[in-house]
A protein has these predicted regions:
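Gram-negative outer-membrane beta-barrel transporters
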Residues: 393-395, 401, 479-480, 484, ...
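Surface-exposed extracellular loop regions of Gram-negative outer-membrane beta-barrel proteins
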Residues: 242-258, 417, 494-499, 510, ...
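Face-selective signature of the C-terminal outer-membrane beta-barrel domain
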Residues: 233, 273-305, 309-311, 315-498, ...
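Extracytoplasmic beta-strand/coil segments of soluble accessory domains associated
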Residues: 44, 73-117, 121
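Membrane-embedded beta-barrel scaffold of Gram-negative outer-membrane proteins
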Residues: 284, 290-296, 300-304, 525, ...
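Transmembrane beta-barrel wall of Gram-negative outer-membrane proteins
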Residues: 177-206, 211-248, 267-290, 487-489, ...
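A beta-strand signature from Gram-negative outer-membrane beta-barrel systems
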Residues: 119-121, 130-174, 184
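C-terminal beta-signal and adjacent terminal beta-strands/loops
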Residues: 540, 609, 710-720, 739-804
Length: 804
């Protein structure tokens, strides 16, 4: 860490000297950003006491990816990419170690907004990046150290600004295709007429997937109608999107060694649908006061089917259900003393019952045993959420005591209603690892539950969460170089959960979480093109309805699925410190922009996900303290012929406590399935080192070529919180792209991903190789507990773009 900190301090020094030489040659253009979710009168970027990274529309087009996460990963220092779902359209990003993920079960530490609307889903704060059309994005601003964005902004916030007819005019259509059966297309149209504007964007994509049984289909639409005059501007906008995926997920490493495209148990599919309607606007009350506001309604539906390994065994002869099917009881705490009625009740609770509440017998013959049957389950969940809300904000830019000043006050309300149901059916794992039914085996295809509702229990619940926020922030120019910012946001989260079936009354709960989060900092303009900043803030996130219902290790949940009665969770509080430099200067006929910073976020009562001994299940737990600290360095040079960028990030993400955590499939786990964590152990799934670089070169006025390099360091497997096992290896990927403008309106383009066809993994965790799949007749015997999500091999795509 010391060497990295020295690098973070010294590297900007070279650029500072350059700034001094260039100071007289240029006056940097003022860049205005919106530092609150609502788009209104922004603020000079150099007066914001934290890091801001902006990704522009050209960057999304340059990446030529249907996934917004690919571009954020490529262009934002400190953003890493993970893929626990095993599908490139459903990847998650982690910024400074905090996640924004579509996966239920991932604790979410980033707030995501579009048009002032919170995109974190109501039920689990997840972010479904696949539902956002990339061609409709004008820019994406990634903020740190800013609690004004409300809940989940522990690591920062991503604020997406879509295009409209005032900011984008014309017509553009493109179609492309290539490896693994991919065909994708998009169009956008924008027009301005008098006070009115219109904008629409649409995208579609179909891909068979490079891994087995991993097809993808996407359809996305965004539209905007705007009106403005000298004092006001209003936009009515809406979007609809649908997506379906084959979710290949992680595969045992021994299977990948035989076939890099192999998958473990199937089916694994996810289908998402969403619709959004919103209205936002701003109105100039006076020369100094501006009012901004938004209203919205949003619908989201998700259906998930997951074929899983079955952790079943023949019931104990000491139970009331000998020669019947039971859930394996390994990993569950036995009562003390383990005798008599207590022992009998413990064993009986694991008996598997069918939809008619009857125990399921073992198949006849072979000693009437269940132990040789490759049992599996098909788990199904459905989530339907309706969210609506609004926000109102006032901005004043009147001078205070003769000094420049910007004051913002606002508030927001977001309310979500969710209906959720989940169930498991008993299945049979065939040699190809597909989970289906076998009529020769009793209980096949029946919805199952355990006698004690442990691990398996049909569920139907409704939840309601209402989030209130009120905030104020002020930036005061102490001098023409020195600006001070101070602000505060008060969050209230009311969360209600109700059991619809009436079979799990312990699920019924009413919870309230609240907190006042301050922010403060200073910026100092050392030179016209060089600014120093320092800031401090606090932020919080409340446990989600999913997390509140899934924190009991004795009743684990199928993540993305079942909820159970549980001990309460505490809200997470983050304390962030940040210092840095940023600058811009003229260089070699172009412009150079750079930034360098140090950061630290200490989180108390952090929520983490822990695995259960039951396949596919886990639970949530507060841990006393975690720390994420590090360095970010980045620079970008642009001229008429060149674009060059490079960034480096170092993230030291560690636990700051001693204690036992559950990780039953970890090779180093003790007899109780636990591992021991001590202060300084690294949080799994977060690479310490990342280096990214790219270049574009205009060979001629019509022909452009470019390349990108992404190098990611080692990281610990998820589940190796004690850092006792080998790490997930580092990797590097080189991508190429080119475009040729055939005429004024027509451009041909092509992309190559993973030029050198490197084999690498985006995610690693552990599994139990002795489960039901081990009895399915596999051609190899699985013994290695490591399981990986492999990265995509060499792929090439090409297309045509027409712009009028």
């Amino acid at each position: 860490m010391k060497k990295t900190l020295v690098l973070g301090v010294l590297a900007p020094g070279l650029l500072v000297a350059m700034q001094a030489a260039q100071a007289q040659e240029m006056l940097p253009e003022i860049q205005v950003v919106a530092d609150t979710p609502l788009q209104g009168r922004g603020i000079d970027r150099d007066k914001v006491p934290s890091t801001i990274t902006t990704v522009h529309a050209d960057d999304f087009q340059r990446a030529a990816s249907p996934n917004i996460t690919d571009t954020l990963f490529q262009r934002v220092p400190g953003v890493s990419l993970s893929d626990p779902n095993g599908n490139s359209a459903q990847q998650e990003i982690r910024y400074r170690g905090f996640a924004a993920s579509p996966l239920q079960g991932t604790p979410q530490g980033l707030a995501v907004y579009m048009n002032g609307i919170r995109l974190n889903e109501a039920f689990g704060d997840t972010v479904n990046w696949d539902l956002i059309p990339t061609n409709a994005i004008q820019q994406a601003d990634v903020f740190t150290n800013n609690p004004i964005f409300g809940l989940n902004a522990l690591g920062g916030a991503v604020n997406l600004t879509p295009k409209n007819g005032f900011t984008w005019q014309g017509f553009e259509q493109e179609i492309s295709g290539g490896s693994y059966g991919r065909v994708q297309g998009g169009l956008q149209f924008g027009a301005e007429s008098g006070n009115w504007s219109t904008y629409i964007a649409a995208q579609g994509m179909q891909d068979q997937g490079w891994r087995q049984k991993s097809p993808t289909q996407l359809g996305r639409f965004y539209g905007d109608i705007g009106w403005r005059d000298d004092k006001a501007e209003f936009h009515l906008f809406g979007s609809v999107a649908t997506s379906s995926f084959g979710v290949a997920a992680a595969t045992p490493i021994e299977m990948l060694n035989r076939d890099w495209s192999s998958v473990y148990t199937t089916p694994q599919t996810t289908q998402n649908n969403t619709a959004l309607l919103g209205l936002n606007g701003k109105y100039a009350l006076t020369d100094n006061w501006t009012l901004q506001g938004s209203l919205y309604g949003r619908f989201f539906r998700q259906s998930h089917v997951d074929g899983n390994d079955g952790d079943f065994e023949r019931c104990s002869n000491s139970s009331s259900y000998a020669n019947h099917l039971c859930l394996e009881d390994d990993g569950f705490a036995r009562p003390v003393p383990f005798t008599g009625a207590a022992a009998l009740a413990f064993r009986n609770q694991f008996a598997i019952l069918d939809a008619n509440n009857q125990p399921i017998p073992c198949p006849p013959g072979a000693g009437n045993t269940c132990g040789t049957v490759p049992y599996g389950t098909i788990d199904r969940t459905n989530t339907r959420s309706t969210t609506f809300g609004g926000s109102l904000q006032a901005t004043n830019e009147e001078k205070l005591f003769g000094h420049g000043n910007r004051f913002v006050i606002g508030g927001s309300i977001d309310r979500g209603n969710t209906d959720f149901n989940g169930s498991s059916t008993l299945g049979y794992i065939f040699p190809d690892l597909s989970v289906g039914t076998n009529p020769a085996i009793p209980g096949m295809g029946s919805v199952i539950h355990t006698l004690g509702d442990v691990g398996f229990a049909p569920l139907s619940i409704t939840s309601r969460n209402t989030y209130y926020g009120i905030y104020a922030t002020d930036t005061f120019d102490i001098t023409d170089r020195l600006a001070a910012t101070a602000g505060v946001r008060y969050n209230i989260a009311d969360i209600t959960v109700r059991d619809i079936l009436g079979t799990s009354p312990d699920l019924n709960s009413d919870s309230r979480f609240s907190r006042l989060n301050p922010v403060g900092g200073l910026t100092y303009k050392i030179l016209p093109g060089l600014t120093a900043y320092a800031g401090y803030s606090e932020s919080n996130r409340a446990p989600t309805p999913l997390e509140l219902g899934c924190s009991n290790p004795n009743k684990p949940c199928l993540l993305e699925s079942f909820l159970v009665s549980d001990p309460p969770l505490k809200q997470v509080v983050g304390h962030t410190y940040e210092v840095g430099l940023r600058g811009t200067s003229a260089l070699w006929g172009g412009s150079l922009n750079w930034k360098a910073g140090l950061f630290r976020t200490d989180s108390t009562d952090d929520i983490i996900t822990l695995a259960s001994s039951i396949a596919g299940r886990g639970y949530y737990q507060n841990v006393p303290e975690t720390r994420r600290q590090g360095v970010e360095l980045s620079a970008e040079y642009k001229s008429s012929q060149w674009m060059v960028y490079a960034s480096y990030s170092y993230i030291d993400a560690t636990y700051r406590f001693s204690g036992d955590l559950a990780s039953p499939n970890n090779p180093m786990a003790d007899d109780d399935g636990n591992i021991h964590v001590v202060p300084g152990n690294h949080i799994p799934g977060i690479p310490q080192h990342q280096f990214k670089a790219g270049v574009d070169y205009m060979v001629t006025a019509e022909w452009k070529v470019g390349a990108d390099l992404i190098a990611v360091g080692q990281q610990y497997f998820v589940g190796d919180d004690s850092n006792q096992n080998p790490k997930l290896p580092a990797y590097a990927v080189v991508n190429l792209h080119t475009s040729y403008q055939v005429s004024k309106n027509v451009t041909l383009f092509a992309n190559i991903n993973n030029l050198f066809n490197n084999k690498y993994a985006l995610y690693g965790t552990y599994f139990d190789p002795s489960g039901g799949a081990a009895k399915a007749g596999l051609p190899i015997t699985l013994t290695d507990q490591r399981t990986l999500v492999p990265g995509m091999p060499f792929a090439i795509y090409g297309g045509i773009r027409v712009k009028l």
